[in-house]
Every structure is written in C-alpha cells, then in structure tokens.
Amino acid sequence: MPREIITIQVGQCGNQIGMEFWKQLCLEHGIGKDGLLEDFATQGGDRKDVFFYQADDQHFIPRSLLIDLEPRVINGIQNSEYRNLYNHENIFVAEHGGGAGNNWASGYHQGEQVVDDIMDMVDREADGSDSLEGFVLCHSIAGGTGSGMGSYLLETLNDRYSKKLVQTYSVFPNQMETSDVVVQPYNSLLTLKRLTLNADCVVVLDNTALNRIAVERLHLSNPTFAQTNSLVSTVMSASTTTLRYPGYMNNDLVGLLASLIPTPRCHFLMTGYTPLTVERQVNMIRKTTVLDVMRRLLQTKNVMVSSYARTKEASQAKYISILNIIQGEVDPTQVHESLQRIRERKLVNFIDWAPASIQVALSRKSPYVQTTHRVSGLMLANHTSIRHLFGKCLGQYEKLRKKQAFLDNYRKFPMFADNDLSEFDESREIIESLVDEYKACESPDYIKWGMEDPGEANVAADLDSKLVV
C-alpha cells in the first residue's frame, strides 16, 4: 500500500521550485503536461500514487497545494503548458493579492487569518489518501510569504497532524551577494526557530552553494533562477526515487529519515548530486562507476551547502550519517567494494558515538528519461559543518539587531505589538542551542550533552512516536 505524501508550496520561491519538481516527476513517470499518461508509458513498476492521484477521467493530479499571498507566480503556472495538471481547488491566492512585503511578521499574521481555508484544502487531500505518511513543504526562509506563512503552516500541521512526518525543502539566501531584502536576517532567524521545533527533517538548499555549483561545475557565467531551480528539482526528484520506484528498503519516508536523524534537533540535511544534469550541455560524457559517483559525492565542491568554517574548524567537522541513493544499472557487489575502498582511504570522518557507515539505497532509473550516464547518485548527509551556516545567519541578525534597524516593520503586527521583541530573543536562543548541539556532536561525549535539559526529552519522545513504523 502506498504511503502518500502531500506537497505544500508556499510563496514565490516555493511555487517555482515546486513547479520544476512536478515537471520532473511528470517526465519520469511518463505523464503528459495535461496529466494524461503518454502512450509509451506502459512499463509500469513505478508508484505514481505516492505523489499523484487519478481523477475520474483517468488523468493524474499532483497531491499538491499552491499557496501565495500575491498572484504573479501562480498566474504564471496557471497560464503555462501545465495549467491543466493541477487541481484548481488546491490553489490559494490571497484576495487582496498584496503579498507579504518580504516581512515575516506580515506573512505569519496573514497565515493566521486564512489558515481555515488552507487547512480545509489540506484536510480534503488527507481524506483522499489511503495511508497518508506526511507532508513536504517547499519554501524560502528569507522573504515574507515562504518564511512567515510557511512558519505558521508548520506550526498548524504539527498541531493537527502530530503523528505525520513533516519534511521541508528550505531555500537559504545567497550570503555572498547583498540582498534586496534588507530584513532577510530577521526573517531567516524567525523561520529557523520553526524549522527546528516543528519539522522532522529539513533539506537545506543553500543559494550560495547552488550558484557556486552552477558557475564552477556547469560553467554558467551568470546562472538564472530557472537554472538553479532545475538543480533543486533534480535533488528533490532524486531524493524521492526510492519512494516512487520502490525496492526492499527505504521505500517510505520514515525508512529514509530514520537512519539519517539519530537525534531530534539535528535534523538538517545537506545534499550532493553527481553527475549534474546541465553538464550534458557541455558535451562531456564520462564513464560513471559506483565508486566514482560515491567518491565525488563526498567532495565538498559537489555539496549543495556552503561551509563557512575556517580551515581548523572544517577539519573537526564530522558526518553524523550519510545516505547515498544510487540510480542506474548497479551490481550490489560494486557497492560493497566501493564502500570498502572509501573506508580504506579514510575519505569520510564520522562521529565517534554512533555506527560509522554510509547507507546505500539502490534505485531504478525512469525508463522514460534518457540520460548519457549509466550511474548517478544523490547524497543526503547530516554533517556538523552545517552549524556554520546557522552561525552566519545569527551573525547577520546580530548586526541588524544591534542597530535596532527596521524593527518598526515588525512592530505593526500583533506578535511584536507594544515593542515586545521577545520572539526574536527566543528564536536566537533556540538557534544558538542548535549550533551548540551540532558542535557537541563532534565530541565523543555527546551522548551526555543536554541531559540537564528536560525539554530535550520531550522533543525526542515526540519524534520517536512519528518514527514508529
């Protein structure tokens, strides 16, 4: 029986990466732009109903909600070739259509006002599922709608569907460029608090690293949003292949996440992918072997999160867990040999307090998508260096907060009324504690860390109840 997953796309960024994700899924399952199965798509063996369901006229509809507070991106989707793919009852655009003005507090407040309409859609999708496993939220943490409204929805989902898994694909802003969103550090910090407390797994998509990969690996001098979004959709579709082309293991979300997240707070994952899709435009075909793919996945230049660590700190960072999803014609003995070579060469630095092993899931490739490479791989990794990304967010927040800059934008909303800025302070404390915990993971004594904090035990018990298969 399939374990269905409902995708919720919030804000401009969430809907753009969501759109690319559905295009990719349609290609891989032989589904046309109108949702009808292509004539050649007869081979089967895939599970379409994890992400799609069939209407009475047999066309496939994504289990997806498209939500935004301003109409531009969703209008673009409704006027695109894929306009007949979605269920139009699952599209929500705010009546006044003014957006959230890149303000977290505005997005959160508007989320409170329209939550009943949105949860009606969620409930309808959930009721249409035989065995709902959880939700996937696509959003960005820097703007207003994806961050603020996304935060409110995370809290509500956690409250109403407490036994269901919530995974997010969260886009972090480009830290190397000056942002046009001056309050980005505030928005990011407030969203990070909810991602820490209300999500079971966060796949971090770091725009800094995505841009770097597009420039260095794909030789694009000035990558567009569409090009970085296609990298994101590659990662999203690859991370769900074992759910859609099931094997003996890792064929549901719980199975995927259980080995990656040993402790409840440290649930932020980084990704790596090879060989990259757009590389084919550079007319470069190379021999791909399992060892080659697995070795490349461990190279920092292929990891889609920038480490802001200094050299000494970087050398102390360790992997908590790794899952490699290998697609293509692969013999399990090749996997075994590759793991042995990686171990012999000491290519991976694991933590001392848990089993040090790379998990490998083998998955079939879609028969409908032609690729020039025989083997491709996605790495999902829990790595302690991610704390430097959060440290960077904290540093930028502190700079703004010291100057009391732009706080009036937030004081207009109920949560920050009467100059009550405790929400900022609480968010900062939670993220500082998260950074400390990831740092503590590097030490062999981590198991004793945080024992004096009774709150930790409650969070752990909550996640454990969801991870009971």
Swiss-Prot record:
Q: Which Gene3D superfamilies match?
A: Helix hairpin bin (1.10.287.600), Tubulin/FtsZ, C-terminal domain (3.30.1330.20), Tubulin/FtsZ, GTPase domain (3.40.50.1440)
Top-rank taxon, per record: Eukaryota
Task: Enumerate the SUPFAM superfamilies for this protein.
Answer: Tubulin C-terminal domain-like, Tubulin nucleotide-binding domain-like
GO MF annotations in UniProt: GTP binding; microtubule nucleator activity
Give the matching Pfam families.
Tubulin, Tubulin_C
Chain sites annotated for binding GTP: A142, G143, G144, T145, G146, S147, G148
Which UniProt key words apply to this protein? Cytoplasm, Cytoskeleton, GTP-binding, Microtubule, Nucleotide-binding
Q: Which GO terms describe its biological process?
A: cytoplasmic microtubule organization; meiotic spindle organization; microtubule nucleation; mitotic cell cycle; mitotic sister chromatid segregation; mitotic spindle organization
Keyword Cytoplasm annotated: yes
Query: What are the subcellular locations of this protein?
Result: Cytoplasm, Cytoskeleton, Microtubule organizing center
GO CC, sorted alphabetically, is: cytoplasm; gamma-tubulin ring complex; microtubule; nucleus; spindle
Q: What does this protein do?
A: Tubulin is the major constituent of microtubules. The gamma chain is found at microtubule organizing centers (MTOC) such as the spindle poles, suggesting that it is involved in the minus-end nucleation of microtubule assembly.
Q: Which family does it belong to?
A: Belongs to the tubulin family.
> By what name is this protein known?
Tubulin gamma-2 chain
The species this protein was found in:
Zea mays (Maize)
